[in-house]
A protein has these predicted regions:
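Long, highly charged, low-complexity intrinsically disordered interaction regions
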Residues: 6, 10-111
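Short coil-to-beta-strand transition motifs
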Residues: 1-5
């Protein structure tokens, strides 16, 4: 449904950031690697967005690069891997390293 959101970076919490877009604050869950690359407070940023809707939860997940959101989508499509596990994996492993681990069958990295 959403491709991206562009807005003012307001701040962050443990596992999400807040982005202001036209006076509306969006809670966007993201990886540690994206959080580490966020601009200074009150600066404009563009995040690629994936909306996840479950019976008990609706959430936005955002990333600075298309590669990272595509990897997140791929990882959470695996049976038994949820959005929290996907964010955790992307927080400790770069997209490049994850691609290599998948192609080479490196189970240690993937576990």
């Amino acid at each position: 449904m959403f491709e991206y959101i562009k807005g003012i970076f307001v701040g962050f919490n443990k596992d999400y950031i807040v982005l202001d877009n036209n006076g509306m604050g969006y809670r966007i869950y993201t990886s540690g690697s994206t959080m580490a690359k966020m601009p200074k407070t009150n600066e404009t940023v563009l995040l690629y967005i994936k909306q996840i809707v479950r019976e008990d939860f609706i959430g936005l997940y955002g990333f600075l690069t298309k590669d990272e959101i595509e990897m997140f989508s791929l990882v959470i499509s695996i049976n038994g891997v949820g959005s929290k596990a996907g964010l955790s994996l992307l927080s400790i492993c770069s997209v490049t390293n994850l691609k290599y681990a998948i192609v080479s069958g490196d189970e240690k990295t993937l576990i």
